[in-house]
Every structure is written in C-alpha cells, then in structure tokens.
C-alpha cells in the first residue's frame, strides 16, 4: 500500500486502492510512531522470522494454523535484510495526508495496522491483515464496483 502510494506520485493514476495498509504516517500504530522517535525498530530480533508459525500467529492471530501453507506463499518475503529495510521505510514514512483518489480497504481485526488508527476507509468486518486471502468473496463482489465507479 505504501509503495503503490509512492509510485502514484511519479505516474498518472485515476485511483489508488490500498488494502490492509495506511494512507499516512498518522495512521501508523502508536508503537510504530514511538519506534521512529526512539529508533527502537532497529533492535527488533528479526531472526525469529524463520519460525514461520510464530510469525503467522503474531501477525494474523491464533486461528490461522489451518491456513499455514497459504500464508507461507503470501509471506514469501522473509529475508532479514528485506524486513529491516521494509520496517525502516514504514516507520520513517513522511506522508502527512493522502490523495483524494486513494480508496482504502481495511479489516476491523488487523493486528499490524489496527483499525482504531485508520480514518476514511471501507472497513471489512472481521478482516485481518491477510484478508485479501481470507475474504476473497468480499473482494470479488466489491472490487469491480470500486474500480469502475467515478
């Protein structure tokens, strides 16, 4: 979501649709905002990323064990260097406000970017950070309309 918003600044777009993301640094969870000030994010023990089941349970909640193989495919970027870079980019993102053409779809149960920090979004009840996988029916029913409407 953040990357596509940055790309929209250097190319002409009609709309940007982000899912399970944030539109500005103000929507980041308080811990991420504090981490920027303290630089605590630099000391995260990212080696635990190889313990895939723990990672999945942390990010998506304990009810996901049945879907481990699907999440393994979805979370293919588990390289420690990539994660350090990505966390640094997210925590230090400077965007203060979003563009009018951004459509934000967000789950009410997202643990990575909790919905209490999210403003002006289409909320998917029960959706978590991986709702693009778990709520396929909702996306199949609603995305075509969101893409084509004015």
Region spans (language model):
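Glycine-rich nucleophile elbow surrounding the catalytic serine of serine-hydrolase chemistry
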Residues: 1-8
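Short loop/helix-cap segments at secondary-structure boundaries that form the rim of catalytic
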Residues: 8-10, 97-98, 112-120
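Flexible "cap/lid" loop of the alpha/beta hydrolase fold
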Residues: 12-47
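Conserved beta-strand scaffold positions in the cores of enzyme catalytic domains, especially
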Residues: 16, 102-104, 120-123
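Short aromatic-enriched loop/helix-cap "lid" or pocket-rim segments at secondary-structure transitions
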Residues: 28-32, 114-118, 135
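Conserved alpha/beta-hydrolase catalytic His-Asp/Glu region
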Residues: 48-96
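Short beta-strand/loop motif that positions the catalytic acidic residue
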Residues: 104-106, 110
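Catalytic active-site module of serine/aspartate enzymes centered on a nucleophile-bearing elbow/loop
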Residues: 121-150
């Amino acid at each position: 979501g953040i990357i596509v918003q940055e790309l929209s600044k250097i190319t002409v777009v009609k709309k940007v649709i982000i899912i399970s993301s944030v539109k500005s640094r103000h929507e980041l969870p308080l811990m991420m905002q504090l981490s920027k000030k303290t630089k605590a994010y630099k000391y995260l023990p990212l080696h635990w990323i190889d313990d895939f089941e723990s990672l999945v349970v942390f990010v998506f909640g304990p009810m996901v064990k049945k879907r481990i193989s699907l999440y393994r495919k979805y979370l293919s970027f588990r390289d420690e260097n990539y994660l350090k870079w990505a966390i640094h980019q997210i925590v230090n993102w400077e965007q203060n406000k979003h563009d009018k053409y951004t459509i934000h779809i967000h789950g009410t149960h997202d643990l990575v970017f909790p919905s209490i920090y999210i403003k002006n979004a289409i909320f998917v009840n029960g959706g978590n950070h991986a709702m693009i996988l778990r709520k396929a029916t909702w996306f199949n029913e609603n995305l075509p309309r969101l893409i084509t409407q004015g």
